[in-house]
């Protein structure tokens, strides 16, 4: 499969993808990376999560960025010692292109007392005839955090031209409810508000996904955060000014079909709708957690 040619074909067949060829190319590489990991058995101990999971497992309309997994609190990164070589060999042979895979420092990942995140960076030269162009890059992250839910699902075809062989790949992934909880934890704990978290929360809400305050509390504990709900409250207060800044619209145009853009961020009132949705859901979480903790314990 020629990734560059297939990405161009997909975008040519769908005018609404105009200008998104690089992002489509990255999504095709996601399939390739997951296929290689499945082939060599690396996925068995991992659980897929995050926005790319929403896209590749549940059919989200937001294009994806990175591959995020959790392996559990006691995950042993040594079982991934050959991941770099396998990815390099499979991608190089399949595409006859130059590939570079960097892996984490395994010695630094051996501390079981703290949460560890192993990061692999896969770069592929998709246009070798144009040396001035940057290589396509995919980030793969695996964290020593527990998945509290797990369902086995096949990959979905995000584009009709995606090879049928990919949909035979089965992955363990979090439920929509847990991904929603993750999104609120991320909203609270990231250094800054991320546009994709806001979009994903509203997308999940439109699918009637309920967020469990107790699961959010447990996840804050998983990350050793004792003031998670306070941080979430602060972020909800910051949200209106962030959304009014224009940063949200600018970022999301990289990940949305033109038809989705026209029906969402270009519509009057859409930003207000997002703010209202996320704040309402967040306030429900805050009320639920406070009602379970009496002011005076007896």
Please provide the spans of the model-predicted regions:
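Glycine-rich beta-strand-to-loop/alpha-helix junction loops that act as flexible
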Residues: 49-52
């Amino acid at each position: 499969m020629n990734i560059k040619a297939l990405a161009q074909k997909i975008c040519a067949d769908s005018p609404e993808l105009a200008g998104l060829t690089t992002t489509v190319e990255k999504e095709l590489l996601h399939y390739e990376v997951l296929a290689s990991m499945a082939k060599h058995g690396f996925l068995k101990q991992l659980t897929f999560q995050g926005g790319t999971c929403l896209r590749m497992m549940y059919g989200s309309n937001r294009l994806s960025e990175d591959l995020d997994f959790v392996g559990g609190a006691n995950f042993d990164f040594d079982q991934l010692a050959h991941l770099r070589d396998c990815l390099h060999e499979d991608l190089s042979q399949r595409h006859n292109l130059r590939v570079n895979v960097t892996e984490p420092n395994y010695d630094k990942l051996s501390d079981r007392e703290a949460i560890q995140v192993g990061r692999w960076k896969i770069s592929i030269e998709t246009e070798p005839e144009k040396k001035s162009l940057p290589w396509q890059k995919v980030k793969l992250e695996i964290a020593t955090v527990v998945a509290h839910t797990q369902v086995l699902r096949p990959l979905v075809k995000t584009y009709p031209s995606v090879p049928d062989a990919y949909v035979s790949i089965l992955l363990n992934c979090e439920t929509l409810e847990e991904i929603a909880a993750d999104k609120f934890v991320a909203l609270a704990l990231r250094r800054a508000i991320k546009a994709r978290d806001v979009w994903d929360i509203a997308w999940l809400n439109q699918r009637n996904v309920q967020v469990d305050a107790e699961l959010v509390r447990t996840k804050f504990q998983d990350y050793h955060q004792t003031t998670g709900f306070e941080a979430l409250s602060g972020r909800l207060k910051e949200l209106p000014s962030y959304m009014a800044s224009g940063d949200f619209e600018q970022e999301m145009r990289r990940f949305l079909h033109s038809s989705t853009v026209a029906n969402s961020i270009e519509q009057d009132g859409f930003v207000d709708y997002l703010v209202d949705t996320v704040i309402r859901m967040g306030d429900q979480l805050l009320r639920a957690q406070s009602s379970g903790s009496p002011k005076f314990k007896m």
